[in-house]
Amino acid sequence: ETKVVTDYRTPFVTYGYLATQRLDYGTYGGLSAGFRTDFSSAFGAASTPQTFPRGDAYLRVSELGIFKNSAISTTVEDFKLRAAYGEAGIQPRPFDRYITLNTGVIGAGNAFYFPLTQSNPNLNVEISKELEIGTDIGLNLGKSSPWLNSVNFSGSYWKRSTDNAIFNVDAAPSSGVGTVK
């Protein structure tokens, strides 16, 4: 009778700090800013903590005196401009940077083999950056209707980019490796 016993442990340490602050000026507008700093054992021994900033701001134009006193304010009840920017990081998985061995059983014996996905010691943290600019508009369609008194519209433009994306790339069959990170 053959018994197979396996054990798997992934030592992994991660911690971070988050700081954020919001300031509003009545109902006219506001802004917030902050950052998050993360450290992970998956970053590698020589790596430093990664910091990701964020911020947003809005201006409710419909609250300004020049807008409230205009003829358009009876139809456009709410008009807000907004913008936001932020960065986020995705860390490599534990051991994605280091050569590892997998275990298996061949017949009645144990075997070690290299995994099909080759590690990459040059992996960095994947960082996504996003900018969003938008507006919110509320229209008053008239109080005489029993329904559909108002309509709200929101529009946004956003752009996201990613640096150091982590994904598997097929390797040449002659390399003996299936994929490389």
Report each predicted region and the residues it spans.
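Extracellular/periplasmic, surface-exposed regions of secreted and cell-surface proteins
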Residues: E1-K181
